[in-house]
Regions:
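Class I SAM-dependent methyltransferase Rossmann-like catalytic core
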Residues: 1-27
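Conserved class I S-adenosyl-L-methionine
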Residues: 113-140
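Conserved catalytic loop of SAM-dependent methyltransferase domains
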Residues: 159-190
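Short alpha-helix
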Residues: 131, 140-163
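Class I SAM-dependent methyltransferase SAM/SAH-binding core
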Residues: 20, 24-75
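C-terminal lobe and adjacent flexible extensions of AdoMet/dcAdoMet transferase-like proteins
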Residues: 178-229
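Hydrophobic beta-strand segment of the Class I
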Residues: 85-86
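A short glycine-rich, Lys/Arg-flanked "PGG" loop and its adjoining helix->strand segment in the class I
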Residues: 98-113
């Protein structure tokens, strides 16, 4: 279920900043099919911020306006049919995080986009989470560094296009908490990051260079057989 702390003052301010960071991406230019895996906040917290016509939300349990309840590591979708996959703290909250990332990669179309939200372990929020016995961000099974996340994305064939750190706010419920405005604090004291990555198209290449005008001694079938991806 959804962590209850998202409903208090700390969580509500976090959600507002995450919505703003998401809106700033202008993802309507990314394609026609948007898929969110996992709920964060309400079921429409992010989907109503996009102008993409076809938006879908898949979760592992029924909550609000869910389009489909399914295992996130076995998506009932055809491969390469989604233009944008959005993971709002999804990998942080499930044990099978790499399987979920692999399933996301499979459904993203060629040159499609993956957007991920995560908590920054090197931040006041990360420190409070560790010192609280991992109870502060309840429902979070792990904190994933930007370096680790981008490493996974590259391994799955993505090109990281943008990393945005935000929400430099002291994690307290008091109404007078102060945002950390000074640039010297960023990005290391920002609570959250958003990664935008593009699925790379790997071109077909010939095993040996083709010399114009030189007669080829092998058949077309043999040449095609030597092509690698």
């Amino acid at each position: 279920m959804q962590p209850l702390w998202l409903l208090d003052s700390i969580g509500s301010r976090l959600i507002i900043d995450e919505q703003q960071a998401f809106s700033d991406l202008s993802i309507s230019s990314f394609g026609n099919y948007f898929l969110q895996l996992g709920i964060w906040g309400r079921s429409n917290t992010f989907t109503h911020k996009t102008h993409i016509k076809n938006c879908f939300l898949i979760a592992t349990y029924s909550f609000g306006e869910i389009d489909l309840v399914a295992d996130l590591d076995h998506l009932p979708l055809q491969d390469q049919t989604i233009d944008v996959v959005f993971l709002p703290h999804t990998l942080e909250r499930y044990l099978n995080y790499l399987e979920i990332l692999r399933a996301s990669n499979n459904v993203i179309s060629e040159s499609g986009t993956l957007i991920a939200l995560g908590f920054n372990p090197i931040s006041l929020w990360g420190l409070r989470h560790w010192f609280s016995g991992k109870e502060f961000l309840s429902g979070t099974k792990r904190l994933i560094s930007v370096n680790q996340y981008t490493h996974w994305l590259v391994d799955f064939g993505f090109r990281v296009e943008k990393i945005h750190y935000f929400h430099a706010i002291i994690p307290q419920r008091k109404r007078y908490e102060l945002p950390l405005k000074n640039d010297m604090f960023n990005p290391f004291l920002c609570a959250c990051y958003m990664i935008t990555a593009r699925k790379e198209m790997i071109p077909l290449t010939l095993e040996k260079p083709f010399i114009k005008g030189k007669r080829q001694k092998t058949s077309l079938v043999d040449s095609m057989g030597r092509m690698t991806i």
